[in-house]
Amino acid sequence: MADLFTKEYNTRTRFTRMCIGEALFVLLDQKEYGQIRISDIVKRAGVSRMTFYHYYDTKEEAVQDYFHEIVKEYVWEVERSKGKLGHFHDRSSIMYALSFFDQYADFILKIVHAGLYSIVIDAMNTYLIEKIRPVYHIPDYELYFYGGALLNVFI
């Protein structure tokens, strides 16, 4: 799960991976993260254990992949806006980001409360370094500061 923006999946593969992510999300309503087993996830997702292990080694990788898909969707939306949101520091851009991720607030808060904050902040940092730094030429430390601040305001 190392590469957030360059790994491409076909529609069927993406659907299977999202079923696994959605199953995990639903199970978080029923159990603590630590009590969820791979067998619970595959049963809920309607896939085999072999399919799960084809994509992931751990349930953390499944969470990471699901969250990365959310971030990819955000990137796609921002790129589709063709600059209408303004500079990424602008209020309109910040409000758009908060509004976009608010639709996933339950999932984000569940993974943060499960002790997986690192998955969220790593995805944020990867987005900033790979998508924002090349455009705005902002130093890494400033991007990390901005990302951490935005994420902490959100949660």
Which residue stretches match the model-derived regions?
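Alpha-helical structural segments
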Residues: 15-26, 30, 44, 61-81, ...
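Short helix-to-loop capping/linker segments positioned immediately adjacent to catalytic or ligand/cofactor-binding
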Residues: 84-86, 108-113
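Amphipathic alpha-helical packing segments from all-alpha helical-bundle domains
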Residues: 91-93, 112-148
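Alpha-helix N-cap/helix-initiation sites
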Residues: 13, 17, 34-35, 139-147
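Amphipathic alpha-helical segments that line or abut small-molecule/effector binding pockets
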Residues: 87-106, 144
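Helix-turn-helix
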Residues: 27-61
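N-terminal intrinsically disordered/low-complexity leader segments
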Residues: 1-13
